[in-house]
Amino acid sequence: MGAGATGLRGARLSPEERANSSKSRAIDRALSKDHTDDLNRFKILLLGTAESGKSTIFKQMRVLHLDGYAKEDALEYLSIIHSNCMEALTQLVDACTAFGINHDITVQEDVNRFEDFKRKLRDPEGLVIPVVIGRCMDRVWHSPSLQLCYDTRRFRFALLDSAKYFMDNIVRLTEDNYVPSIQDIVHCRISTTGINELAFNYKKMDFKMVDVGGQRSERRKWIHCFDNVDMILFIVSMSDYDQLDPEDNKYNRMKQSYEIFKTIVHSDLFRHASIVLFLNKYDVFVEKLKTSPLRRSFKNYEGDNSEESAREFIKKLFRRCITDRHKFFVFETTATDTGNIDLVFGSAVAHIVNENLRSAGLHE
């Protein structure tokens, strides 16, 4: 009995001890919660050169993981979409002239009407294409001369990636009371300037995605986003393999992307970050290979001109930069395809979570 009483007395805690124990448990819970929050909070830095499709990925995250675009938000893209339509048709008409492709009389009249509308534009920033000009643009687009130029020479001159999408839909896009759809917004091209952030929840995890401009003048801003990055999402345009940098036409655009990627992954700032590479515009890459062999731009490429061989060469090119293969993941993407981006982003997150658990000894 005495021994039992002693045991009981030894198990009792004074009020101070009970208070300290309660406080200790509260601290443990708080630390555990902070640790859990840290595991569940991902900062993604979205990087890539101009026109890689980086901002399209950013828009897709809003579509997939937030509420998309309300009517008033969508209407802010109307002038941008109409500007893209004007740019696309201008590029095609100019290419016809450059390649000596002549229009028949009625098409030339529509081309003249289109050019006259451009000359009279007073406010390009607030551009709205009238219905009658939209119909005119549609006739020019469907003319034999424009179709010949597009079908046989579209990879031989600068052309907006979404030119076909916008031209195929020009009548709808210029109707009265037109409100841009999600796909219209996803396809539109606008240069990113400054730093844009998007916070969203996915698979019970909180994400913050940071998008900065890809133009050379914007890259100096990247350093301001480098704190506490969990994942670098680097976007490379696969279709750039035979393109020169418009800001400095001495440099191949894909080789330039490679050099920037190498600098990023070798930086001490990102030694703990996972690296995800999106090889974007894969659909355009496959089409281009039919008329522009990879070996023409990469002299050290010894494979054939098949999609599989060319793709693996480019993958290996970027993979050579990586020292920790466990933290590197690569996917082929088409940024304008919402389903594709949903699938590959989900796969990337799953790989990273599993790797983090493995590194922590919590997963085989």
Curated annotation (Swiss-Prot):
A lipid is attached at G2 (N-myristoyl glycine). Residues 43-56 are annotated as: G1 motif. Pfam families: G-alpha. Residues 1-29 are annotated as: Disordered. Keywords: GTP-binding, Lipoprotein, Magnesium, Metal-binding, Myristate, Nucleotide-binding, Transducer. Residues 333-338 are annotated as: G5 motif. Residues 14-29 have a biased composition (Basic and acidic residues). Residues 276-283 are annotated as: G4 motif. Residues 207-216 are annotated as: G3 motif. One of its GO terms (molecular function) is metal ion binding. It comes from the Eukaryota. GO terms for biological process: adenylate cyclase-modulating G protein-coupled receptor signaling pathway. G proteins are composed of 3 units; alpha, beta and gamma. The alpha chain contains the guanine nucleotide binding site. Belongs to the G-alpha family. This is Guanine nucleotide-binding protein alpha-6 subunit. It comes from Caenorhabditis elegans. The gene is gpa-6.
